[in-house]
């Protein structure tokens, strides 16, 4: 199976790579901004290739990225969109550049990546967007997460729209709205907070869903949380 993991250099994404790479029949391409971390992954796993990518600037490297996918994979059976950016700040204190960076990373860049890869995805392939309970309708909302939550809500809604558009291609797309997970990003944003789930546990769940969830769901926004969030 040919798998692209968008945002796989740390946290949940890194653990998803580790889990998926255990099956040597999987051919994986991992994207991320941290080239040192990417090199470490490709050195550790023989079935992992990497591509240095800032998803917020995807359009500037689109042609090179598509060429890399064509050379290394040919087709894409699974796409996991994990790349994300979080700034914790009161809405009134945000600058336009900070707000745009969140939206470019969490929504526009991911949407551009999907648009570029769909022509390479066969019938029966599966796209999984990783959203957040912060963007899940009627979930608890938290101070300082206005733009982050809005970007994740946009990604969830896009998932529903694309499920309808991609029916003619036989491509399945779903969205997992994650609750709090103990990761570097959570530690940086909320020092001292202890989440009920760690990155390894969540990665195992996500990996299983990526492989088999397309048999049971399409266009669904599924909360993956013990509490709210």
Per-region residue spans from a language model:
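Substrate-binding pocket helix/loop in short-chain dehydrogenase/reductase
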Residues: 90-91, 98-100
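Catalytic loop of short-chain dehydrogenase/reductase
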Residues: 128-154, 159-160, 164-168
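N-terminal Rossmann NAD(P)H-binding glycine-rich loop of SDR-like oxidoreductase domains
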Residues: 9, 17
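Conserved glycine-rich Rossmann-like NAD(P)H-binding loop of the short-chain dehydrogenase/reductase
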Residues: 24-40
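Rossmann-fold cofactor-recognition segment
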Residues: 45-59
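Conserved NAD(P)H cofactor-binding loop of Rossmann-fold oxidoreductase domains
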Residues: 82-88
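C-terminal helical subdomain
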Residues: 175, 191-229
């Amino acid at each position: 199976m040919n798998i692209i993991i968008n945002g796989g250099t740390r946290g949940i994404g890194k653990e998803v790579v580790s889990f998926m790479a255990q099956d040597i029949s999987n051919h994986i391409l991992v994207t991320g901004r941290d080239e040192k971390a990417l090199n470490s992954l490709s050195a550790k796993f023989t079935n992992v290739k990497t591509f240095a990518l800032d998803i917020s600037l995807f359009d500037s490297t689109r042609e090179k990225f598509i060429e890399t996918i064509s050379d290394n994979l040919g087709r894409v059976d699974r796409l996991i969109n994990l790349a994300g950016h979080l700034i914790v700040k009161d809405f009134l204190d945000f600058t336009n550049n900070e707000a745009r960076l969140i939206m470019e990373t969490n929504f526009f860049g991911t949407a551009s990546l999907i648009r570029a890869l769909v022509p390479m995805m066969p019938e029966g392939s599966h796209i999984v967007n990783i959203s957040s309970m912060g963007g899940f309708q009627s979930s608890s909302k938290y101070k300082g997460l206005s733009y982050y939550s809005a970007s994740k809500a946009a990604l969830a809604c896009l998932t529903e729209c694309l499920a309808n558009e991609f029916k003619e291609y036989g491509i399945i797309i779903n969205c997992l709205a994650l609750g709090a997970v103990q990761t570097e990003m959570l530690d940086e944003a909320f020092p001292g907070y202890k989440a009920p789930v760690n990155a390894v546990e969540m990665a195992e769940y996500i990996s299983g869903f990526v492989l088999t969830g397309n048999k049971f769901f399409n266009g669904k926004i599924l909360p993956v949380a013990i509490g709210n969030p």
